């Protein structure tokens, strides 16, 4: 027919172009009907992944056909008229009718066999033509009507078989698509579940790590606090000892002063007594005479007085030496105490610096964890989210 626009090929027709030629070359004696059956079985055995390129090619051909023929509309041929002469379908009309009856589905992803069954219908029409146009005697009208009914019944049965085969194949394809969708949906759920478990494990591990760091940091702070308390106690004890030493030194010095004052009073008392004795000696000539008469006593008294003075000087010198020694010890203790305070101050500054560094590290780790958790969560959401599969 001139001006007739063919419909675009579906996925099976795209696939069967090369396969039909190969099968015909391998089996030259095989009929076209048998070739179509084998091609249908082979197409049915292919997986969805193997069929996907042919579905894509069929979709591309459909788009090109729509662009080339924008006003195209499928219009099936009308039902063929019965010949007035013989009462049977003409061969070309029968072939066209069979082709039109086999136009099942317009979905580009559905498996149809229009081209193959049109060829089979054409072969069928040629066989019928060779049969109907043989020179035989014209039977009676009843016999012709019976033959026509048989032919129509055979054609109807053949069409029903093809329709059943197509329906069965459509059901199998729908079941496969549903199984594939269910499998993909199950895989997506499993991936999302695995990703969620990984995030939970990462979060638990990081939380445990943070708790351990916090516990260690708390222990370090407690140790630092205990160390400070110990140092404070030591300082207090040293201060108390120093105060006791000062008190002892003060008591000792006070005692020495009292002792010196007492000795001085004794010396004054002795000197006063000695003066009184001299006055008495001057006032009593008899005693003076006795004193002159006894020069040895005077010498003894003078020697005794000199010994007393030497003893007093030695005692004073010894006390001065003792005071100097005590003063030197106090200076040494004060110097040692000052060094201990300086060491404690330096140690305290070092601990404060370490604590600040630990706090800064802990803050940086928290910031890194928050950034990592945000990026990982965003990637997980982007990876897991997507269109939900169609319901079965």
From Swiss-Prot:
<dbReference type="Pfam" id="PF00505">
    <property type="entry name" value="HMG_box"/>
</dbReference>
<keyword id="KW-0010">Activator</keyword>
<dbReference type="GO" id="GO:0000122">
    <property type="term" value="P:negative regulation of transcription by RNA polymerase II"/>
</dbReference>
<keyword id="KW-0007">Acetylation</keyword>
<dbReference type="GO" id="GO:0030154">
    <property type="term" value="P:cell differentiation"/>
</dbReference>
<dbReference type="InterPro" id="IPR036910">
    <property type="entry name" value="HMG_box_dom_sf"/>
</dbReference>
<feature type="compositionally biased region" description="Low complexity">
    <location>
        <begin position="144"/>
        <end position="181"/>
    </location>
</feature>
<dbReference type="GO" id="GO:0000981">
    <property type="term" value="F:DNA-binding transcription factor activity, RNA polymerase II-specific"/>
</dbReference>
<keyword id="KW-0112">Calmodulin-binding</keyword>
<dbReference type="GO" id="GO:0010629">
    <property type="term" value="P:negative regulation of gene expression"/>
</dbReference>
<dbReference type="GO" id="GO:0010628">
    <property type="term" value="P:positive regulation of gene expression"/>
</dbReference>
<feature type="compositionally biased region" description="Basic and acidic residues">
    <location>
        <begin position="239"/>
        <end position="250"/>
    </location>
</feature>
<dbReference type="InterPro" id="IPR050140">
    <property type="entry name" value="SRY-related_HMG-box_TF-like"/>
</dbReference>
<feature type="region of interest" description="Sufficient for interaction with KPNB1">
    <location>
        <begin position="4"/>
        <end position="81"/>
    </location>
</feature>
<dbReference type="GO" id="GO:0008584">
    <property type="term" value="P:male gonad development"/>
</dbReference>
<dbReference type="GO" id="GO:0005516">
    <property type="term" value="F:calmodulin binding"/>
</dbReference>
<feature type="region of interest" description="Required for nuclear localization">
    <location>
        <begin position="6"/>
        <end position="22"/>
    </location>
</feature>
<keyword id="KW-0221">Differentiation</keyword>
<feature type="region of interest" description="Sufficient for interaction with EP300">
    <location>
        <begin position="52"/>
        <end position="84"/>
    </location>
</feature>
<comment type="similarity">
    <text>Belongs to the SRY family.</text>
</comment>
<feature type="compositionally biased region" description="Basic and acidic residues">
    <location>
        <begin position="210"/>
        <end position="228"/>
    </location>
</feature>
<feature type="DNA-binding region" description="HMG box">
    <location>
        <begin position="5"/>
        <end position="73"/>
    </location>
</feature>
<keyword id="KW-0678">Repressor</keyword>
<dbReference type="GO" id="GO:2000020">
    <property type="term" value="P:positive regulation of male gonad development"/>
</dbReference>
<dbReference type="GO" id="GO:0005667">
    <property type="term" value="C:transcription regulator complex"/>
</dbReference>
<keyword id="KW-0805">Transcription regulation</keyword>
<feature type="compositionally biased region" description="Basic and acidic residues">
    <location>
        <begin position="182"/>
        <end position="197"/>
    </location>
</feature>
<keyword id="KW-0804">Transcription</keyword>
<dbReference type="GO" id="GO:0008301">
    <property type="term" value="F:DNA binding, bending"/>
</dbReference>
<dbReference type="GO" id="GO:0007283">
    <property type="term" value="P:spermatogenesis"/>
</dbReference>
<dbReference type="GO" id="GO:0005654">
    <property type="term" value="C:nucleoplasm"/>
</dbReference>
<dbReference type="GO" id="GO:0007530">
    <property type="term" value="P:sex determination"/>
</dbReference>
<feature type="compositionally biased region" description="Basic and acidic residues">
    <location>
        <begin position="313"/>
        <end position="349"/>
    </location>
</feature>
<keyword id="KW-0963">Cytoplasm</keyword>
<dbReference type="GO" id="GO:0016607">
    <property type="term" value="C:nuclear speck"/>
</dbReference>
<feature type="modified residue" description="N6-acetyllysine">
    <location>
        <position position="81"/>
    </location>
</feature>
<feature type="region of interest" description="Disordered">
    <location>
        <begin position="142"/>
        <end position="361"/>
    </location>
</feature>
<comment type="function">
    <text>Transcriptional regulator that controls a genetic switch in male development. It is necessary and sufficient for initiating male sex determination by directing the development of supporting cell precursors (pre-Sertoli cells) as Sertoli rather than granulosa cells. Involved in different aspects of gene regulation including promoter activation or repression. Binds to the DNA consensus sequence 5'-[AT]AACAA[AT]-3'. SRY HMG box recognizes DNA by partial intercalation in the minor groove and promotes DNA bending. Also involved in pre-mRNA splicing.</text>
</comment>
<keyword id="KW-0539">Nucleus</keyword>
<comment type="subunit">
    <text>Interacts with KPNB1, ZNF208 isoform KRAB-O, PARP1 and SLC9A3R2. The interaction with KPNB1 is sensitive to dissociation by Ran in the GTP-bound form. Interaction with PARP1 impaired its DNA-binding activity. Interacts with CALM, EP300, HDAC3 and WT1. The interaction with EP300 modulates its DNA-binding activity.</text>
</comment>
<keyword id="KW-0013">ADP-ribosylation</keyword>
<feature type="region of interest" description="Required for nuclear localization">
    <location>
        <begin position="75"/>
        <end position="81"/>
    </location>
</feature>
């Amino acid at each position: 027919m001139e001006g007739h626009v063919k419909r675009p090929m579906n996925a099976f027709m795209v696939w069967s172009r090369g396969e039909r030629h190969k099968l015909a070359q391998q089996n030259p004696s095989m009929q076209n009907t048998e070739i179509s059956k084998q091609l249908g079985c082979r197409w049915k055995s292919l997986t969805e992944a193997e069929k996907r390129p042919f579905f894509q090619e069929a979709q591309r051909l459909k788009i090109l056909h729509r662009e080339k023929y924008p006003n195209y509309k499928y219009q099936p041929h009308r039902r063929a008229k019965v010949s007035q002469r013989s009462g049977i379908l003409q061969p070309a009309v029968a072939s066209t009718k069979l082709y039109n009856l086999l136009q099942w589905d317009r979905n580009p992803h559905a498996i149809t066999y229009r081209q193959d069954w049109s060829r089979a219908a054409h072969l069928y029409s040629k066989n019928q033509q060779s049969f109907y146009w043989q020179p035989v005697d014209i039977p009676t009208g009843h016999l012709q009507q019976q033959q026509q009914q048989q032919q129509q019944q055979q054609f109807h049965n053949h069409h029903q078989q093809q329709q059943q085969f197509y329906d069965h194949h459509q059901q199998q394809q729908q079941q496969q698509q549903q199984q594939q969708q269910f499998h993909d949906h199950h895989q997506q759920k499993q991936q999302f579940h695995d990703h969620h478990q990984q995030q939970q494990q990462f979060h638990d591990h990081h939380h445990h790590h943070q708790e351990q760091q916090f516990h260690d940091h708390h222990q370090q702070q407690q140790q630092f606090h205990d160390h400070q308390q110990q140092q404070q106690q030591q300082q207090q004890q040293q201060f108390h000892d120093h105060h006791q030493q000062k008190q002892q030194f003060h008591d000792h010095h006070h005692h020495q002063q009292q002792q010196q004052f007492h000795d001085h009073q004794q010396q004054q008392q002795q000197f006063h007594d000695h003066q009184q004795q001299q006055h008495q000696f001057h006032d009593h000539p008899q005693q003076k005479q006795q004193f002159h008469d006894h020069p040895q006593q005077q010498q003894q008294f003078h020697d005794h007085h000199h010994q007393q003075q030497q003893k007093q000087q030695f005692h004073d010198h010894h006390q001065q030496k003792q005071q100097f020694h005590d003063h030197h010890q106090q200076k040494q203790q004060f110097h040692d105490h000052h060094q201990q305070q300086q060491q404690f101050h330096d140690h305290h500054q070092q601990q404060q610096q370490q604590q600040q560094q630990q706090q800064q590290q802990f803050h940086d780790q928290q910031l890194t964890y928050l950034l990592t958790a945000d990026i990982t969560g965003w990637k997980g959401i982007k990876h897991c989210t997507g269109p939900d599969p169609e319901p079965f």
